[in-house]
């Protein structure tokens, strides 16, 4: 006979084991690899995720690390939508990292991050503006 039930039980068990605190369904840590060492980074310390030629996370303290993920969609699924917002194709930002949001004439918004990430200016379509404002104003 087929052994599917037991393998699905195993995966359930594994899920429970790898996430003992099932109350939080969002990812609490990301692992970065630095010089062949692994380092756990708390999700709340991440200012933004960026998809460039390589993928990076910028921390609130200004550090930047390469991180393994295929798409930002896949990262978005793991994050608390109250905490993180998908600004555009390239960035997901932490509400705690936002310094200012400035509408510019060619129908977009420029999001400036707090020190020490102030060099990061993130463009967002003006179409997202009402939703984004509502997201920030809580």
Name each region found by the language model.
Residues 122, 130-138:
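C-terminal output/interaction extensions
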Residues 2-119:
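Conserved binding/recognition cores within well-folded domains
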